[in-house]
């Protein structure tokens, strides 16, 4: 069963890890020189998979993520609705997860 709280906390743990970095070249969670890399969409893909929304990680991109997330049960909302922690925000070229600072010291 999918668990948004698990996906959310996985994202926070990764963002707080000093051995995680940003790379589009190594975006599929590859570890190079002791640093594990993601880009914005591959991090969302990893966290959604960890949370049980996806059976295996497709390493989606911002261009392809819409279909994967809708298929996993996520729903689109309008920009004027209040954001909740764990909501995934998307625009052309970037995605991120809404973060509540009371839940830890990192950013998503």
Language model features with spans:
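Membrane-embedded alpha-helical bundles of multi-pass integral membrane proteins
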Residues: 62-66
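Short alpha-helix capping/helix-loop boundary micro-motifs
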Residues: 71-80
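Loop/turn positions that initiate beta-strands
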Residues: 85-87
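Intrinsically disordered/low-complexity terminal segments and short unstructured peptides
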Residues: 60-61, 77, 107
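N-terminal capping segments
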Residues: 1-57, 92-94
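A short, compositionally biased micro-patch
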Residues: 89-92, 101
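Catalytic Cys-His active-site segments of thiol-dependent hydrolases/isopeptidases
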Residues: 97-108
């Amino acid at each position: 069963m999918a668990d948004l709280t698990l996906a959310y906390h996985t994202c926070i743990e990764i963002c707080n890890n000093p051995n995680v970095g940003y790379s589009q070249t190594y975006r599929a969670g590859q570890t190079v020189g002791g640093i594990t890399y993601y880009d914005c969409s591959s991090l969302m893909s990893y966290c959604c998979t960890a949370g049980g929304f996806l059976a295996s990680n497709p390493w989606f991109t911002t261009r392809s993520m819409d279909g994967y997330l809708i298929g996993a049960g996520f729903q689109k909302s309008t920009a004027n609705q209040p954001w909740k922690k764990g909501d995934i925000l998307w625009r052309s070229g970037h995605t991120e997860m809404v973060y509540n600072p009371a839940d830890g010291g990192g950013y998503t």
